[in-house]
Amino acid sequence: MPQTFDTWIKSDRAQQFDLIRLKMIKKAYDANLDWTILTNPKYNIKQMHEIWITMLYNNNPRPLCNPKLTDQQMRILRKGIEEGFDMSPYNDPNIEQTQLFEIFSNLMKNKKEN
């Protein structure tokens, strides 16, 4: 049986989160978004925010769901997703931020040319 928000918030897992992160998870729940994506305690606040924003705009946040990504990598991936690109192949934390930005820039350049 899937866990409800009410049972999760009372669980030991929820106790791992500070108030700011709990509020973000609650906002996702209140917006009928998949709040369970945000319950990975390895995400920092900025990473959670990038995932939450992606979900808020009805985009698939799965390419961002790697806690080893930096905040900046997540932000670039989110921008790519918002532009309609499949960013799944680029969610490798070993891709440097500058290289990831170059990939995003090239995708945007190709989009404008077509």
Spans of model-derived segments:
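General marker for long, soluble alpha-helical cores
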Residues: 1-114
